[in-house]
Each structure stands twice: as structure tokens, then as C-alpha cells.
Amino acid sequence: MPLRLPDKLPAIELLKKDNIFVMNETRAHTQMVRPLRIVVLNLMPLKITTETDLVRLLSNTPLQIEINFMRLKSHTPRNTPVEHMQMFYKSFKELSLQKWDGMIVTGAPIELMPFEDVEYWQEIQTIFNWARTHVTSTLYICWAAQAGLYHFYGIPKHELPQKMFGVFRQYPLIPDLPIFRGFDDTFMMPHSRHTEVWRSDIEKVHELKIIAESPDSGVSMVMAREGREFFITGHLEYAPDTLDKEYKRDNGKRNDVVKPFNYYRDDDPSKGPFVSWRSYANLFFCNWINYYVYQETPYNIEEIE
């Protein structure tokens, strides 16, 4: 799939090494097609890494996709150069004037804070409400999934006694859904979080469907509004070495750090990770783009409501 990205975005050179077809804006303007328009609200600290992870997964269909990145007014990132944010990110005020075929809201390392104590909570609520009338389908990932479930449906999050950290086997509960097209009877998903949502809370809300879960990591996927909203509690988008970097960053600094479960070869960090989720991640994002964005969005994007 030709990915339409801003000129000079750092992810471009990395993706070209993976033989992913990347099209800059100059070339894209010469093609007489309407690209799917995806906006990404990237709340992760290492923004360039997350950009690359997501863009790589959006590269698996023959559709042209235009990707834009959104920044918050109420929060200034500390781990990303100001120049990068100014060059590649646009404000919600600017992007909110347009409509979008799809949206992705990432996680953020703030899950132990009450939602109302997050400095950008009010702005996030405004963006969530806006997405319901301006986006065909939205993916909420990890913290964003918990935040969206709380904001829209009053689902609380609960602190875990120990960090959910590793790669866990998931079970599709409605396997004939288009989002699971091509999936096996089980699939793997990385998790890295200190909080969770409970099945018992979600089951009280008839608008919500739990579509995948694990006996070890709990609810992993929730769908609402016939696929216009997906809440994903894990990280299918993670690169092979992400959990390894988290473990090495925290090991020795805190007493509660444990090795990521079911991740290293022979459970030995020196042998590197055993990647068991990559194919499912590609399938999931491909199915989302095809069945819940491309096939549902109007050709006239202004008709989204």
C-alpha cells in the first residue's frame, strides 16, 4: 500500500528499509484518487518510535492512506524534539475542522493517575466527543482504551497487584466478526500496564461487546457502535524489542520489575524476544482499515456523522 506521509518524516527511511512503499505528499497529489485519511493522536513519550510502529502496520492494503499526527494544546512532550512536533504534528484546533476516515489514539504512561488528574483530561474528552461525529472508526489503545471506556460508558479502571507485562494468549469471542478475518482460534498480544477493566463492569453496558479476552490478561478487545469504536487494552502495534527495552530500562531501578511473560526465548533475556504476535497485528490493522474504515466511510468525506 502506498503510505502518504509528510515529507521528511523520520519513519520514511526506516520503512523503506522494510520494502514498504512510502509516497511523499508531492507525489501523492499527482494521483487522481481519494486517499483514506487517518489521524493519530500520539500520546506515547517516544513519539518517533510509535509513529514508525503504527505506520508500518497501516501499510498492508492496496489503498492509499494519508496519515496526520495530532498534538495536544494542554501538554508539551518532554522526550521528542520541539522541531519534530512543529514539523509533523498539527493541533486539534486545526485538524478538528476536517473529517476523517479513521483515528488511532495511543496509550500513555499515566494509568495509575485518576483520569480527572491528568493534565490534558479535559482536552482529551473534547477530542473523544469530536471523534464520534467526525471519524468513521476509531481505535483506542491501552490507556486510551481505558480512558474512552470511562468517558463514554463510565467503566472504571482497577489497579493490578502486579504489572501485566508480557505476551498473552487471547481468545476471540465472536470469531466471525470481520475484524478477526484470517485469525486463528487464538492469537497473541503484548501487554504492558498497571491497571485493567473488568468484564463484570463492561457486561452491564449493553452498547459494549467484549470480542476478545484472555484468562491471564483479562479483557483485551471491546467493540462499540458496530465497529465505529474499538478499545484495545494491549499493544498489537509493539515492535519486537519494545518490551525488552522497557524491561532493561526499569530492571534494577524498582523492586517490582519482573521479566516480561512468554516473551524471551527460553525465558532468557540474553537470547532475545520470540515474536509471536506480528502476523495478528498485521491482520488486525488490515481488517480494521478494510472492513471498518474503507467499506464504511462515504466517498464524500464530509458526509461522515
Annotated model-derived regions:
Residues 85, 89-93, 108, 115:
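Helical hinge/lid and interdomain linker segments adjacent to catalytic or ligand-binding clefts
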Residues 50-53, 79-82, 115-116:
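Short, glycine/acidic-enriched capping/hinge loops at junctions between secondary-structure elements
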Residues 1-74, 89, 93-95, 99, ...:
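Amide-donor transfer/coupling interface in amidating biosynthetic enzymes
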Residues 73-86:
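N-terminal beta-loop-helix "entrance" segment that forms/cooperates
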Residues 100, 105-174:
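Cysteine-nucleophile active-site neighborhood
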